[in-house]
């Protein structure tokens, strides 16, 4: 996303505190639905920026009050357990590089007061991305807070 695109998104900002929600999922849409509902509620009192790294969900509307940013999407191949870009013209490194640039640009332009992670710390496939996001936010705003939105159910292989 270009700086001019981001500036257009910020045209309606007020003086409310700013929150970035980092949402990543590789199967299903549960994390996305949770993040959108959380963002929708929080947008009544905050400027909320939802940063989505999973596949776009076309039939689940994000409220207009939430600033939505779709990163290049990744999914996990169930057979190989490998992350794969949804856009097959990208290799994994290029996809992560593009995501990193988008995250850095958003953090620089918003200087968030709060980061909410969805699917982290349990989503260890994205540990480097989220840890870099946290470090970048803290370097821009040392007073920012970090919150983990935990909803994962860890199951054993036998379903117990």
Where in this protein do the model-derived segments appear?
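Gly/Ser/Thr-rich loops at beta-strand to alpha-helix junctions
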Residues: 25-29, 120-126, 153-154
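Short amphipathic alpha-helix
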Residues: 31-42
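Active-site-proximal region of nucleotide-activated glycan assembly enzymes
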Residues: 130-160
């Amino acid at each position: 996303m270009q700086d001019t695109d981001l500036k257009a998104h910020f045209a309606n900002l007020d003086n409310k505190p700013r929150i970035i929600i980092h949402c990543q999922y590789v199967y299903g849409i549960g994390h996305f639905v949770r993040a959108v509902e959380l963002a929708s509620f929080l947008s009544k009192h905050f400027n909320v920026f939802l940063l989505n790294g999973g596949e776009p969900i076309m039939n689940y509307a994000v409220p207009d009050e939430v600033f939505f940013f779709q990163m290049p999407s990744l999914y996990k191949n169930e057979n190989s357990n490998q992350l794969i870009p949804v856009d097959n013209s990208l290799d994994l490194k290029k996809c992560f590089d593009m995501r990193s640039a988008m995250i850095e640009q958003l953090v620089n332009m918003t200087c968030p007061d709060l980061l909410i992670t969805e699917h982290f710390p349990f989503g260890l496939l994205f540990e480097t991305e989220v840890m870099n996001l946290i470090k970048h936010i803290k370097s821009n705003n040392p007073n920012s807070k970090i919150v983990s939105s935990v909803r994962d159910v860890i199951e054993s292989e036998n379903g117990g």
